[in-house]
A protein has these predicted regions:
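Short metal-coordination and nucleic-acid-contact micro-motifs, chiefly zinc-binding Cys/His arrays
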Residues: 19-22, 72-75, 101
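Short flanking/linker segments adjacent to small metal-binding domains or redox-active Cys/His motifs
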Residues: 80-88, 124-128
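Short, structured motif recognition centered on aromatic/hydrophobic residues
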Residues: 23-27, 31-36, 74-77, 86
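Mid-chain, well-packed structural core segment of small domains
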Residues: 68-72, 77-80
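Short, intrinsically disordered terminal segments enriched in charged and Pro/Gly residues
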Residues: 1-17, 93-128
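Short recognition patches in nucleic-acid-associated and regulatory proteins
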Residues: 1-13, 27, 31-68, 91-93, ...
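Extended aliphatic helical segments
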Residues: 9-11, 58-59, 72-75, 86, ...
């Protein structure tokens, strides 16, 4: 079996999957967000931002072309270890956080162990 360094897969720009320990990891500082079988966002610092801070009004008045915070919220996710912004999502107020990355870890491990897939430079590739 490959070493732990070779069993880490880059999933997003700032998020890695450590396959042997089945954990989400910040690839900037190594902070562990939690189990890879759960939503990594639960391990992040969360900032619920007023959309008017990001999308400033274009004109004065009721119809300013700035999103209404009663209709939309901007949720920012940060690494507690280094402060890197890991993700952002736009949600209706009251909507639960999106569980947008769910990897079938057992199937992935099986395909790696069978030799069908390999990890090269933190990327999955088909075996040749």
């Amino acid at each position: 079996m490959a070493s732990n360094a070779n069993r880490r897969i880059r999933v997003t720009e700032y998020l890695d999957l450590e396959l042997d320990r089945e954990q989400w990891i910040c690839n900037r500082c190594g902070h562990i967000f939690g189990s890879a079988r759960d939503n990594y966002k639960k391990g992040c610092l969360i900032h619920d931002r007023d959309p008017r801070e990001i999308h400033l009004p274009i004109v004065e008045g009721d119809y300013s072309f700035s999103p209404d915070p009663l209709w939309v919220r901007i949720v920012e996710f940060y690494c507690p270890g280094c402060g890197t912004q890991v993700d952002t999502e736009y949600l209706p107020p009251g909507h639960p956080l999106t569980h947008d990355i769910e990897i079938d870890i057992d199937a992935l491990k099986s395909r790696l162990e069978s030799g069908e897939l390999v990890i090269k430079d933190q990327r999955l590739e088909a075996a040749q």
